[in-house]
Amino acid sequence: VTYTLTVKANVVPDGEIIRCWLPYPREDNRRQKNVALLAVSDSEYTIAPKNALHRTLYMEKKAVKDQQAVFSFSFRYTSAAEWFNLTDEMIQPYDTSSTLYKEFTAERSTHILFTPAIRELSRQVVGNEKRPLQMVRKIFTYINNNYSWASAREYSTVPNIPEYVIENKHGDCGMVSLLFITLCRLNGIPAKWQSGFMMHPGDVNLHDWAEIYFKGIGWVPVD
């Protein structure tokens, strides 16, 4: 994989420092391994720690009048799909006093909020179900069947993204993931946001998805 970022000539005044952060693979995820840096355009660079949430390779250089500034690096890694053949019997009761449980079942402004609209939708979709796996399946199936994909507005212009999805009957990957995360958290299932690049050969794109936590299993990706 090669990332290249080019700053056009004279966009930055001559002599000023241009700072560049390019995405670098995390190595604390079991779905990707064997990360190897192959080449870097600059001799001086910094790679963020392996567990950084937004891991990057950082470079900087002075702007030169009438010259482009090019930042580039290449790496390779091994990726794999991850699939869980889950059953209710595999999932242990949550430790509701744990730090993990409290953090990932809590509201988080401005989008993960247990509003009246979210609570009402939860009553309709989840009903009286108490088994974590079955609650997740109900939430996932409902969202998948009722909200079509649509290109998103700039997220910062939407006051509450899950409610936007409910009201407009559509959303992009991140929007429906936020609705899924919010409904899971409301029902006591730890859930969190994930984001990264889809590295399809010749068709790189950004993507968002969710992960949910089952006691005895760990974090499970949901897309």
What are these regions (language model features)?
Residues V11, K50, V64, Y164, ...:
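Sterically constrained small-residue positions within well-ordered secondary structures
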Residues V1-W83:
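Intrinsically disordered, low-complexity N-terminal segments that are enriched in acidic
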Residues T6-N10, G127, M198:
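Short beta-turn/strand-loop junction motif enriched in small, turn-promoting residues
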Residues E167-K169, F197:
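Active-site rim elements
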Residues M175-D223:
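Hydrophobic/aromatic-rich core segments of domains that either
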Residues P132-I139, K169-C184:
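Active-site nucleophilic cysteine motif
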Residues P49-L53, K65-E167:
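Acidic low-complexity segments
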Residues C20, I139, A210:
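Terminal peptide-recognition signature
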